[in-house]
From Swiss-Prot:
PANTHER family: 60S RIBOSOMAL PROTEIN L35/50S RIBOSOMAL PROTEIN L29 (PTHR10916), LARGE RIBOSOMAL SUBUNIT PROTEIN UL29C (PTHR10916:SF0). InterPro entries: Ribosomal_protein_uL29, Ribosomal_uL29, Ribosomal_uL29_sf. The keyword Ligase does not apply. GO terms for molecular function: structural constituent of ribosome. SUPFAM superfamilies: Ribosomal protein L29 (L29p). Keywords: Ribonucleoprotein, Ribosomal protein. Belongs to the universal ribosomal protein uL29 family. The lineage of its organism: Bacteria, Pseudomonadati, Chlamydiota, Chlamydiia, Chlamydiales. The gene is rpmC. GO terms for cellular component: cytosolic large ribosomal subunit. This is Large ribosomal subunit protein uL29.
Amino acid sequence: MAGKKKLLAELREKSTDELDAFIHENKKALFSLRAEVGLQNKAVKTHLFSMYKKNIARSMTVKQEKEGKIDG
């Protein structure tokens, strides 16, 4: 829980370009994990899938907050 709040605080401090770079890095990492699964690599850490997906979702939410697209 503390890690989630720390990550959100760090994401809110970043600029839009930095958020885009963070999203891109996480998408690349997620893609490489999927490629490893496709190659049937037995050493794939499956918990990383949800971690990367959640990081992407959180950063996109922060990006939308900055752009004022979230009703609240």
